[in-house]
Regions:
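Conserved N-terminal beta-strand and adjoining loop/helix that marks the start
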Residues: 1-23, 92
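Short connector loops at helix/strand junctions that flank enzyme active sites
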Residues: 9, 17, 34, 39, ...
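Active-site-adjacent beta-strand/loop module that shapes the phosphate/pyrophosphate-binding cleft
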Residues: 18, 77-100, 112, 133-138
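Conserved Nudix-box catalytic region and its N-terminal flanking loop in Nudix hydrolases
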Residues: 21-60
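A short beta-turn/loop motif at secondary-structure boundaries
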Residues: 31, 79-83, 105-106
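A short coil-to-beta-strand element that immediately follows conserved catalytic motifs
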Residues: 65-75
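NUDIX/MutT-family hydrolases
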Residues: 102-135
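Charged phosphate-binding loop/patch that engages nucleotide di/tri-phosphates or the phosphate backbone
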Residues: 129-147
Length: 147
């Protein structure tokens, strides 16, 4: 049978924590979420695990190295956009090596630490939901289906 199968996209997201604060990056010039804060993350490129993808994204975006054993999976959000669907996988890390540096200044205006319970008003709604879910122990959620 040659049925066309539905395909969805998968992204990884890193909630990087230090002293009850989360690292957020202000997006710019990406065409998606510009002017809003997001977390480290991106698409799984293929031929890599989700954990490998989040390690790669951390290196590419903020120049840090994560030990795979120190990355904890904390949740999934099934996200609906107008043109496609995503599975977003969320991980937490509280230890890393290397000095934080904005390695993608074209995509990220800057990065900043924020209290977990006091995120800026311009945090991307998906990220706001994901961080709230993490704090409240919610491991699965759906986003964008009511719009």
């Amino acid at each position: 049978m040659d049925a066309k199968r539905f395909l969805l996209r998968c992204a990884v997201n890193l909630i990087l924590l230090e002293n009850e604060k989360v690292l957020l990056l202000l997006r710019g010039n990406t065409g998606f979420g510009d002017g809003n804060y997001g977390v480290i993350g991106g698409h799984i490129d293929g031929d890599e695990t989700a954990r490998e993808a989040v390690i790669r994204e951390a290196q590419e975006e903020v120049n840090i190295h994560l030990n795979p054993e120190c990355i904890k999976f904390v949740g999934t959000i099934h996200r609906k956009l107008s043109h496609c669907e995503y599975i977003d996988l969320f991980f937490v890390a509280e230890s890393w090596s290397g000095l934080l540096e904005n390695k993608e200044p074209v995509k990220h205006v800057h990065y900043k630490w924020f209290e977990l319970n006091s995120l800026p008003h311009n945090t991307m709604p998906l990220v706001n939901t994901a961080i709230s879910n993490y704090v409240n122990g919610i491991f699965y959620d759906e986003f964008g289906w009511d719009e």
